Amino acid sequence: YFSFNHNSSFYFFKDFEKRQNGYTSLVFEELSELLLNYNLRDSQIISSGSYWDANIEIDILTITDNEEVYVAECKWTNHIINKKELHKLNEKCKKLDIKPIQTIFFSKRGFSKELLNNQGKDLALYSSNDFEALVRTTKSNELIKDLFS
């Protein structure tokens, strides 16, 4: 049995307020992976999720059955993503000895002009508008099915 009085609710919401950005960032990563996998729906995905070891963390590492590798970083910040972030992700891939077919960034606030100019087959950039399009064009039961598969 748990009692929730006025004081405990005050501390709960104060604690939540401190951690809200972390929670939101985690949800943003999950939704980013969902969007990536939705866009790769014609491929057979054999593995998708975050990768980390003692030295390297990659937000999303997706591998298809034909051994195509996709790496993605999710940035829930108030800053735009610039080419420095691309270089950091490329360095992580070199250290892991992987050669992604595509590098992907998901951003809350958008991208530098330099990064936007490099967008193409090897580099995909997604903003909040892309999530809105996913929700508008996808049936909710498809999203839910993909979320729990």
Predicted regions located by residue number:
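A cross-kingdom feature that marks ATP-driven nucleic-acid transaction machinery
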Residues: 1-149
